[in-house]
Each structure stands twice: as structure tokens, then as C-alpha cells.
Amino acid sequence: MEPDLHDQQQQQRVHSVVIITLPPSDDPSQGKTISAFTLTDHDYPLEIPPEDNPNPSFQPDPLHRNQQSRLLFSDLSMNSPRLVLGLLGISLLAVAFYASVFPNSVQMFRVSPDERNRDDDDNLRETASFVFPVYHKLRAREFHERILEEDLGLENENFVESMDLELVNPVKVNDVLSTSAGSIDSSTTIFPVGGNVYPDGLYYTRILVGKPEDGQYYHLDIDTGSELTWIQCDAPCTSCAKGANQLYKPRKDNLVRSSEAFCVEVQRNQLTEHCENCHQCDYEIEYADHSYSMGVLTKDKFHLKLHNGSLAESDIVFGCGYDQQGLLLNTLLKTDGILGLSRAKISLPSQLASRGIISNVVGHCLASDLNGEGYIFMGSDLVPSHGMTWVPMLHDSRLDAYQMQVTKMSYGQGMLSLDGENGRVGKVLFDTGSSYTYFPNQAYSQLVTSLQEVSGLELTRDDSDETLPICWRAKTNFPFSSLSDVKKFFRPITLQIGSKWLIISRKLLIQPEDYLIISNKGNVCLGILDGSSVHDGSTIILGDISMRGHLIVYDNVKRRIGWMKSDCVRPREIDHNVPFFQG
């Protein structure tokens, strides 16, 4: 007598396999997949009673499929309870591990795809991101050729024609905000710029300013420590350097009146009294080296390329600098002014954010090698979703700079003093406007003492080299060609942020190549200077030299600062099929 189907199922021994596949670490948005299989010891065919009235077009009710699944799981649970518990335990551990590694992706699993796509579309319509690539400083002819070939993809004879096409049909900001989410997300932006730590001592980007019919490109020194963007102008000019481009010519109807909010913002820290009835808004900014810029506030259109290649324009308030004095004039031989990127309301990112064009997030990535490229961006789209080290941003009502708190600082295994409150807590200020890094006096003296050990190796002090205060030459008198020749003699500097317990703190590691340079004489020089007379004298100023080779992000929305190691060739979030840098 043949056993019926129920008896067969009772006699079969059921096995199960559960496969959990996690997404790749570089693309957690693909989600996880869970596959379950059941196997039996005997090959009994599954017999399904025929329907009385079969209908070929009939689609099975999802409820029936769920009941079938519950039946199979019920049979399995009755026959192999230990196996079920074991599989459930493994599944829970896998899900918990995934949630800890990719919390954002797990949160995305909780909403439907339609809701998630709708939210993404809304967010993309609200803000966009701008990217400003940073290249090594080139000679004028090479720089001009790279602009033509890389940014415009054209030969020299087509340069004028391409500029006309680019300026005649700009996309208004309002049009950009109504652009489809897909086009914004797939676009890129490239502005040819130049700079290095040594010998130029600055990094700058190129921005188009003015109306479409008479717009002019200006090279601006990127400065996260400055609030005001300003350009040398003919108002007329009292003291101006030659600059990289012709002087900006302001229009009278573009001048900012003293009664406007931005004027009050700029003049709040100035010694001169605010004049509400004046027809113009005067400014005077003094920098750490005691050089200064004086001028008036004006307003004009800034043109910024979005990811999709379209050109957005927005009216931006900036300074028309007609009187520059001090060492500032030296940098203005290569640039036309300063691009203020601080937290201040009048900074460029803050103005764009107040108009809803971007999220108030600024990031920069300066490559480590001498011929390196890099970029800066405004907006949150290019902030990596993982791999960043984040620390709280210090809030200082008196200073709109990007600062964090540091609890320990060391050179190798030796501790360096912090000149903060009671010497226990110090502050670090991120400043792309400083070529080099500055330590408080006590920490600097301790570092110099610790570095005396390198003179006993293959190096000896060379006081004849005036590139920087401290330089060493090889005892063989053979000039060094790169930092790879000498970095083995030096030790890393570690900044510990947060708790003093190492296991729960964050660290910023400054490798020897992040604080040394090779001078024109072939010597190695210390790129950390005495900061006794810089800022308040007790703050660590992190300059360009120590930020190279890192992506550093200032998130003013979440009030945090983050960093990660990077080659700075291109933003991680930009599609590799989209040209970003050439050559």
C-alpha cells in the first residue's frame, strides 16, 4: 500500500540552508539578500491536486504563497528545532553586525522603495553640491593650456568661442532648484585652480564673477579661516598687486548699503563705528601676519557649475578691495583675492546655504605629492557615507573658524604640552589660509628639543638655509630629492580628540611627510612654526602642509568636523565614468 502524501512528509527528513549575502562595503545601498532552501532525503514528487476549473490566466493569491511558506517552516520546526534555533541565532547575529557597520542602510530598509526615492528626489531638489578641483601650481603658459584642454576640452583657437557659449546661457538658481533630481545627481563641476605648500604657499580656485555678457574669471585663495570673500578692484585702487587677472570693476548700483544686514555682520568686529546712514559699507580686515585688506562691500553674480554641467548663478555679497598692505601683496601676484569659507554668515557657503542652494557643508582635499591635484566642494552630496572620523565642532561666538578640542598631543612616544585651560585641553583650528602649521610656544619648544635626535643620525642643522626657521642637510652633503629619503628619521605627531582613554577617543595622525618640506637647496625643513604670536598664542593652527592627503569636511549643519585619508584624485561619490580630472 502506497503511503499518502502526509505520511511521506512525516517520513522525510527535512534539511534547510539559509544564505545571507551582505552588500559590498563600497556600495551598501544595494541592500542585503536572504535566501532559504529546503532539502529532503527522498525524491518524492510533490503532488498537487488538479483544479476543477483551471484558468491559465489566474495569478496565485500572495496569501496562499505565505501559507505554503508557513507550512514548510512549521514542518521544519517540528522535525529540527535545534537547527531552527541555530539558524535564527546566526541570522540575528548577521543582521546585528550589518546594522552596526551600515546603520544608514539599515534605516533605509525600513521604508519602501517608493518612499525612499521620493525623499531622495525632494532632498536633491532642495540642495546641490559644487566641486572645485585643486591642481598643482603651473607656469602661466602651462596653466592656460590646462584650462583649455581639461576644463573646456578645446584647443587654444576655440577658447573665446567656448567662453561665449558658456556665458550666454547660464542656468538661473531658481531653475537649478527645479531641475530634476537625476540631472543634478549625475552632474559634475570642475574649476581649474593651482597651488602648493612650497614654494607658492597657497591653494586657489577659479570662479566666474559678473553678468553673462561681461563676466570675468578670478583666482581666489581658498581660506577656511576667513569670513569675507574679496577681490582686488578698481574703485580706483590705492594699493593693489598685479594679480592673476584684471581688476574687478564695481558698479555703483551694486554697492551694499550700510543699513543691510551683511554690513552689520562684517563691521561687528571692526574698530570703526557702524554708520547706518552711509551710502556704502566699508570694511577692513587684518590677518595673522598683520597684513590687511580695505574696501567696500558690493554684490554681483557668482557662476558655479553643478554636477550636471549646467551653470548656476547667484547674487553674492563680497568685498571690493582697493587697498592691500603687507605680505598679502606677495600672494596677490598669483591670485586676485580671498575666498572666505568660514562659518560666518557672509562666507560664500553660508550665503549659498541661506538661499537653499546647498547644505552648509564645506570639504577640501589637497593631494600630498608636489604635482598633486585636489578639490574643494560645497554641499553634502560628496560627503562619504562611511570611513570618516567625526568629532564635534567647537562653537565660539567670538570666532567663526572651524575648531575642535584636543586632549593629548605627542611626538612619537613623547608627550607635548597643551597651552589650553590648565594645560589639559587645547584647541585645533583648521586654516587653509595658512601654508604651515603653528604650535603654541611650549609645545613647539618641546618638539624642537625632541627633534635634536635626528642630528645624531644622518642629518645636521643647516642655519644657512633660510627657507624655514629649522632645516637639516645630509651629512654627506648630498641634496635630498623627496621626503621619502628622510621621513624615516622622523616620527609621527598624534592629536588625540575626545576622551583621554585611547580606546574611545579619536586620533588625527600627522605623518612626517605632513610637516616637512624639501627646500630649493635640497635640505629638509620643519613646516611647524612657533605660534606664540599667531591668533591667541595657545591654539594649534593646522595649515595646508598638515592637511594634505586627507579629505576634511566641515559640516555646519550637524556641527562636526571629519577627515579620512585620500589620494584626493576625485571625490569617492562621483561616478568613475564621468570625467573629473584629465591627465
Curated annotation (Swiss-Prot):
One of its GO terms (biological process) is proteolysis. The active site is at residues 223, 431. Its EC number is 3.4.23.-. The keyword Cytoplasm does not apply. Residues 203-564 form the Peptidase A1 domain. GO terms for molecular function: aspartic-type endopeptidase activity. Keywords: Aspartyl protease, Hydrolase, Membrane, Protease, Transmembrane, Transmembrane helix. Its main location: membrane. The keyword Glycoprotein does not apply. The chain crosses the membrane at residues 83-103. GO terms for cellular component: membrane. It is found in: Membrane. SUPFAM superfamilies: Acid proteases. Disruption phenotype: Enhanced susceptibility to B.cinerea and permissive fungal growth. It is a single-pass membrane protein. Involved in proteolytic processing of BAG6 and plant basal immunity. Interacts with BAG6 and BAGP1. Belongs to the peptidase A1 family. This is Aspartyl protease APCB1. It comes from Arabidopsis thaliana.
